Regions:
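A short beta-strand motif characteristic of beta-propeller blades
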Residues: 9-14, 54-59, 98-103, 143-148, ...
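Solenoidal tandem-repeat scaffolds enriched in leucines and small polar residues
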Residues: 20-96
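WD40/WD-repeat beta-propeller blade-loop signature
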Residues: 21, 30, 65, 74, ...
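Loop/turn segments within WD40 beta-propeller blades
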Residues: 25-32, 70-76, 114-120, 150, ...
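WD40/WD-repeat beta-propeller blade N-cap
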Residues: 15-22, 59-66, 103-110, 149-154, ...
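Terminal intrinsically disordered, low-complexity extensions flanking WD-repeat/beta-propeller proteins
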Residues: 151-153, 160-162, 173-179, 183-261
């Protein structure tokens, strides 16, 4: 279903897309198509601008549930992660349903995926409980630039707009958020701060379109709004600026700009 953010009313019924639970979605920022991933291991592109919402592309390299999806800022590359520990990079311009990169560098499910907004080929991924690493990739070559052990399950990732900082959210056993700084010259990812406000596993992150705020939601049923990437003194970084139980989502395509809807 597609919902109106202002009224909460359903506006489009996408019908039967997958043969299993559909647990992850991603908007292509250029084509405005919706990409869906499912327990049936398939990935579909849906064109919501056309009557009937036709399926325009199928990707089926995964053998288990697709649990992570993210389009690059230019809409040319899709990153997908699966429960079989596989990360795939797909070229949107290629008609063949085969990824140009397929890697099992992670030792657990790849749910957390985030593209750097200012470095087109820089991709961050996070592994589950049996992996517990954040990996940075050169998406052009498929090479791992850095692998950082976090000591805990990685559930979400979000980049700053232009400062090379990365926010990670975590589940078992730390239930925290961390801010890291990526030094490309040294190929090092260094932790700056930890934020422990959730009382249970942090499930996911969502970022406002202007990058000024990040929302985290946990299994404690609380949504927290953070000012994380503050360029001022460290005292301003990681500030909790809101706490809610009415959980919705930011989306620049339908919301029409920044803000929590």
């Amino acid at each position: 279903m597609v919902f109106d953010f202002e009224t909460g009313a359903p506006v489009r019924d996408l019908g039967w897309v997958h043969d299993g639970r559909c647990g992850v979605l991603a908007w292509n920022p250029e084509t405005r198509t919706l990409t869906t991933g499912s327990r049936d291991s398939c990935i579909w592109d849906l064109d919501l601008r056309c009557p009937g919402f036709p399926k325009t592309a199928l990707r089926s390299k995964h053998t288990q549930e697709v649990c992570g999806l993210a389009w690059s800022p230019d809409g040319r590359t899709l990153a997908s992660g699966g429960n079989e520990n596989l990360l795939c990079l797909w070229d949107a311009r290629c008609s063949r349903p085969e990824p140009r990169v397929a890697s099992k560098a992670h030792a657990a499910a790849v749910k957390a995926i985030a593209w750097s907004p200012d470095k087109r080929s820089l991709l961050a991924t996070g592994g589950g409980t049996l992996d517990q690493t954040v990996k940075l990739w050169n998406a052009s070559s498929g090479a791992v630039l850095e692998s950082k052990a976090t000591g805990t399950q990685v559930t979400g990732l979000a980049w700053s707009k232009d400062t090379g900082q990365l926010l990670s959210s975590h589940g078992f056993s730390q239930n925290q958020l961390c801010v890291w700084r990526w030094d490309a010259a040294k190929r090092s990812l260094d932790k700056l701060i930890e934020m422990r406000k959730h009382t249970a596993r942090v499930l996911a992150l969502a970022q406002s379109p202007d990058f000024s705020r990040v929302a985290s939601v946990g299994s404690d049923e609380v949504l927290m709004i953070w000012s994380v990437f503050d360029a001022r003194a460290d005292a301003g970084r990681g500030a909790l600026v809101g706490k809610h139980r009415d959980v919705r989502r930011w989306d620049p395509v339908f919301a029409g700009g920044a803000g929590l809807r």
